Regions:
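Acidic metal-phosphate-binding loop of nucleotide-sugar-dependent transferases
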Residues: 39, 66-68, 170
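Active-site-adjacent helix/loop segment of glycosyltransferases
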Residues: 178-181, 185-249
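Short glycine- and hydrophobic/aromatic-rich loop-to-beta-strand nucleating segment
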Residues: 129-136, 146-155, 159, 177
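Conserved donor NDP-sugar-binding/catalytic core segment of glycosyltransferases
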Residues: 68-104
Length: 249
C-alpha cells in the first residue's frame, strides 16, 4: 500500500467514512499531511503549529491519540475562550475510561516532586503528591493552574504566538510544564471542569527503562532552565494556586 492509500484509509477510519468525508470536505475541512523527521513531542507539534500560524488559525488543539471526547466538548471550549480573552490555554476535566478523575491540573513541581516519583516509595510521598496534584480542590470548579497536562492543550493562537511554541530541547516529557508555565506568565491557563474528556494514560515512563531515562533527562533540562531549589517564581505561583482553593494545601 502506498502513502496516498494509507492516508485515505486513515482519513476514512478517523473521520467516519466516505459520506462524512464528503460532508466535511464541503464544509471546508482539510486533512493536511506534513512529512517531517521525529523531533519529539513538542517538535512534532511545532510543525503543525507553524502551519496553523500560516493559516491564521484562531485556536489550536494539541491532543494525545489515547484521548477521546464527545461532540459537545469543542464548542463549549471555543464559546468560553471567545468570551474570555484573558485565557490563553484551557483543559477540560480528564477521566480514566472507568470514570475516575485524573489529577492532571497541578502546581509547579519542585525537584522533590519530580524525583520523588522515581526514587521514593509511594507511601512516603503520598501526602505531598496530594498537595502537588491539588486533590483538596475537588476538581469541581474552574482554576487558573500553571501546569496542565499535555494530553489536551487547547491554545489561543494569538497567545501562543506571543509566548512561543514548544521548547524543542524537551524531546518527550516536561514540555507541557514548560509550555503551560510560559503561558501562565501572561495569560490564564484554565482547568475547565464543565466539560469532560477521557484519557487512557498508560504512564509509559513507569513501564519502560528507556522512557524513564528520557523522562529523567527532560526533568533535568527543565530544572536547569527554570531553577532547581532557587526558583522564586515557582513559589509565588504555587502560593497563588493555594489561595485559589482556600489555602487548604
Amino acid at each position: 500500500m502506498d502513502l496516498k492509500q494509507e492516508l485515505q484509509e486513515f482519513a476514512q477510519r478517523v473521520l467516519g467514512g466516505e459520506p462524512e468525508l464528503k460532508r466535511k470536505a464541503e464544509a471546508g475541512f482539510r486533512l493536511i499531511y506534513i512529512p517531517h523527521e521525529n523531533n519529539g513531542y513538542g517538535g512534532g507539534h511545532n510543525v503543525a503549529l507553524k502551519e496553523a500560524q500560516k493559516l491564521g488559525s484562531v485556536y489550536h488543539l494539541v491532543v494525545n491519540p489515547d484521548v477521546w471526547f464527545g461532540p459537545e466538548v469543542m464548542p463549549a471550549l471555543i464559546e468560553y475562550m471567545d468570551a474570555h480573552e484573558e485565557v490563553g490555554q484551557i483543559m477540560p476535566k480528564v477521566l480514566y475510561p472507568n470514570g475516575q478523575i485524573q489529577r492532571l491540573a497541578k502546581m509547579l513541581p519542585t525537584p522533590l516532586d519530580f524525583f520523588g516519583r522515581f526514587c521514593l516509595p509511594e507511601f512516603l510521598i503520598r501526602r505531598r503528591n496530594k498537595k502537588f496534584e491539588l486533590v483538596q480542590s475537588g476538581f469541581s470548579k474552574k482554576m487558573n493552574i500553571p501546569f496542565l497536562s499535555g494530553c489536551f492543550m487547547f491554545f489561543r493562537m494569538s497567545a501562543l504566538n506571543e509566548v512561543g511554541l514548544f521548547d524543542e530541547q524537551f524531546f518527550l516529557y516536561a514540555e507541557d510544564i514548560d509550555m503551560t508555565r510560559r503561558m501562565h506568565q501572561k495569560y490564564e491557563t484554565l482547568f475547565f471542569p464543565s466539560t469532560t474528556i477521557y484519557h487512557t494514560f498508560t504512564r509509559g515512563s513507569r513501564r519502560s527503562l528507556r522512557l524513564m531515562w528520557i523522562h529523567i533527562i527532560s526533568t533535568i533540562k527543565y530544572l536547569n532552565k527554570w531553577g532547581w531549589w532557587n526558583d522564586s517564581e515557582r513559589k509565588e505561583i504555587n502560593e497563588n494556586v493555594k489561595a485559589q482553593i482556600g489555602g487548604a494545601l
